[in-house]
Amino acid sequence: MSKVSGSNGGDSKNTLYCSFCGKSQHEVRKLIAGPTVFICDECVELCMDIIREENKTSMVKSRDGVPTPQEIIKVLDEYVIGQQQAKRILSVAVHNHYKRLAHAAKSSDVELAKSNIMLVGPTGCGKTYLAQTLARIIDVPFTMADATTLTEAGYVGEDVENIILKLLQAADYNVERAQRGIVYIDEVDKISRKSDNPSITRDVSGEGVQQALLKIMEGTVASVPPQGGRKHPQQEFLQVDTTNILFICGGAFAGLDKIISARGEKTSIGFGATVRAPEDRRVGEVLRELEPEDLVKFGLIPEFIGRLPVLATLEDLDEDALIQILSEPKNALVKQYQRLFEMEDVELNFHEDALREIARRAIVRKTGARGLRSIMEKILLDTMFELPTLEGVREVVISDEVVKGTARPLYIYSERSEEKTNVSA
């Protein structure tokens, strides 16, 4: 196959066109010639996107027709940087969950219990994003709930049954599909018990919510009002069995590392006591030693922890990981902004030092990967404001000085606009 480069000149009689989209060689970067047809670089890219999507949906299945853990983790790797242990735990847990459902469909005297998952990690390390990515690659209904909005039944706020309603809506009110879905409950650390004394006052948004979640996580038939909201006696309810719904809970658990560290220290007093240096390990390293008893001390009730037998801890992201997150995944932030600039026919490029400075600033803010977008927005705000009204800008280059605020982005103009400027001068 031969390549034909796009150019601005040329005889119209000899102009070649893409056989798929009909664009001429002057409208595209490359035109690839076959024996009797031509295809442009844009159509090649579109075809590759279609193939990638099909590969994602037609994952390799195990004997039970369930996606294999290797296949699940392979797709997770395309979107989520690092967190290999957490990805491994998640992929095995999801694989086993759907194997269990396939097993339950057959008559057997051995009943396989459900293994719900708890994700623990610092803010911005990828807990929510892992769950969202899982939802995209597994063909089951999925919903996310915020634990901070939940209250006990009868109080102002959302009932726990509303979570099942959201799952039912995600399944287009197909009860059978909803009963095989996945529910992710975020910010679960915010419903920890407010006091070590369980009888102090009624804790309707803390321990009360944990108690309310117990039955739906273990398995019960929930009565769900089809149009949402509070229940009315005249309403007809949909009955949803939650036995086969996989629950994943996630939270940052700020301060949990101190509880774990305190458990590991055997303090002594007197002249023979060992003088310990202050804890200099990263939060993610400390969380690896997490035990269920630490979560009880944090404020979760033992019954709630017992419904979440699979514990996965996530690492806090270092500078190198944040740089990878900025540039490597399929929907990396740099790629997103480059696509935005492409819509203005402008190429956006970042120096390696600029990405490193952005990562450093995110670490200082202690917001993890979540803080990267706000830093990028601040850096590119003036450029995005000016660009639509500027003529002839071909490329914008961001250096570390731009990130630090000591310089402006470098604008590179096309030769044509420079010629026009010289003529007008």
From Swiss-Prot:
ClpX-type ZB domain sequence ranges: 6-59
Binding-site residues for ATP, renumbered to this chain: 122-129
Subunit annotation: Component of the ClpX-ClpP complex. Forms a hexameric ring that, in the presence of ATP, binds to fourteen ClpP subunits assembled into a disk-like structure with a central cavity, resembling the structure of eukaryotic proteasomes.
Role of this protein: ATP-dependent specificity component of the Clp protease. It directs the protease to specific substrates. Can perform chaperone functions in the absence of ClpP.
Record's keyword terms, sorted: ATP-binding, Chaperone, Metal-binding, Nucleotide-binding, Zinc
Family designation: Belongs to the ClpX chaperone family.
Identification of the protein by name: ATP-dependent Clp protease ATP-binding subunit ClpX
HAMAP family: ClpX
Binding site residues for Zn(2+): 18, 21, 40, 43
Gene name of the encoded protein: clpX
Gene Ontology BP term (one): proteolysis involved in protein catabolic process
Gene Ontology, cellular component aspect: HslUV protease complex
A GO molecular-function annotation: ATP binding
Family matches, as InterPro entries: AAA+_ATPase (IPR003593), ATP-dep_Clp_protease_ClpX (IPR050052), ATPase_AAA_core (IPR003959), Clp_ATPase_C (IPR019489), Clp_protease_ATP-bd_su_ClpX (IPR004487), ClpX_bact (IPR046425), P-loop_NTPase (IPR027417), Znf_CppX_C4 (IPR010603)
